[in-house]
Amino acid sequence: MIKVNLDHTNIDINKVVDLNKVKQIHQMIINKTGKGNDYLGWLNWPNDYNKTEYEQMKQVANKLRSEIEVLVVIGIGGSYLGCRAADEMIRGLYHQDKVELIYAGNTMSSTYIYQLVEYLKNKNFGICVISKSGTTTEPGISFRVFEKLLVDKVGLNKAKDLIVAITDKNKGALKQLADKKGYQTFVIPNDIGGRFSVLTPVGIFPLLVSGINTDNIFNGALKAKNELINDDLSNQAYKYAVIRNYLYNQGYKTDALISYELQLQMLTEWWKQLFGESEGKDNKGLLPSSMIFSTDLHSLGQWVQEGPRNVMFETIIKIEKPNYDLNVPIDEDNYDGLNYLTKNSFHQINQTALKGAIQAHSVTGNMPNIVLEFEKMDDEQFGYLVYFFELALTMSAYLLDVNPFNQPGVEVYKYNMFKLLNKPGIK
């Protein structure tokens, strides 16, 4: 369901790949012997997810869905990016479905939080708070705000039915709070890190409340697991990892993920965390960036075309079938001179822009373009691409000889912030 097309890189990957190394790393992955192997639980998750808990989540989600208009998903990083990526990719940006998902706990902006409070005052809403520890600053202080808003609105007894916590099975501040107050809880597995957790209750529960078919998401992930099993470049995930690593070793610094669909913008944000937090260690790693074309062709396109060379390459998501399409209307006066486009649909024009940009950037601009060919934007495709990118990332990180599953660098800013805020115990 995803094909890696390297025709626009001017590279014969079979001549540059160290296939023995790929095979060696493949064995490290499947045998769980590489760095950070305690966090490879996602590898077999499409088979091994807790079916009993999944059915419980469906029941709770259906009840919640019948009572609310809005679900406030409170989390940061991997605790919300995957869910939001799925929601926007599958339902689009202006869907008319019964339950709206909105997001908090991913910022400390007072203006954003205030406006969200005002928006919710006249809405029937529930809360899904997501945190392994329950002590992460952004979701912690946001949950205080929205929990109070909900309790003040409906009372404590009713609020118990409208708040769900996704957290550790046995310990942590959020687990302790939820048990004390009687909130329903579901489990974040110990062997799956946050940025790999979208197919766990972290992403699946709020998506169930939204009405998205999560069975199809699991089907897509399982299909990827069953297809991406080879230890050579017929494995499309490994093919993507190898070409990225080759370009990195040639001196390229940035991999820009390009989408021509606005509803994939949050997918690119999820991808940036997945690759950036996993690879950016020991002074190594490509900088993951993203652009939305054709929008950014009118702002960053000049830099892409004529800026410094051998700094950035592009990974382009090409969608074969849009969720919807429409034609360009005829205008009798034709003042804009665009009637020649009325023979084409918007998707055909968008695809033509994609082809034109690839030619401009890869041929004229001499910038490698990797094309990821997706069939469509639906629930099954989302499950597939999650597994594809997680496997590609793991191979890519091991090719760099870094641990894909830790993130020690993010603790530095937290320490400085806590010290400035006079947090007890911080010197």
From Swiss-Prot:
Its EC number is 5.3.1.9. GO terms for cellular component: cytosol. The keyword Isomerase applies. It catalyses: alpha-D-glucose 6-phosphate = beta-D-fructose 6-phosphate. GO terms for biological process: gluconeogenesis; glucose 6-phosphate metabolic process; glycolytic process. The keyword Cytoplasm applies. GO terms for molecular function: carbohydrate derivative binding; glucose-6-phosphate isomerase activity; monosaccharide binding. It comes from the Bacteria. It holds the Pfam family PGI. Its main location: cytoplasm. CDD domains: SIS_PGI_1, SIS_PGI_2. Pathway: Carbohydrate biosynthesis; gluconeogenesis; Carbohydrate degradation; glycolysis; D-glyceraldehyde 3-phosphate and glycerone phosphate from D-glucose: step 2/4. The active site is at 277 (proton donor), 298, 414. It is an enzyme of class 5 (isomerase). Keywords: Cytoplasm, Gluconeogenesis, Glycolysis, Isomerase. Coiled coil: none annotated. It is found in: Cytoplasm. Signal peptide: none annotated. InterPro entries: G6P_Isomerase, Phosphoglucose_isomerase_CS, SIS_dom_sf, SIS_PGI_1, SIS_PGI_2. HAMAP family: G6P_isomerase. Belongs to the GPI family. Catalyzes the reversible isomerization of glucose-6-phosphate to fructose-6-phosphate. This is Glucose-6-phosphate isomerase. The lineage of its organism: Bacteria, Bacillati, Mycoplasmatota, Mollicutes, Mycoplasmataceae. The gene is pgi.
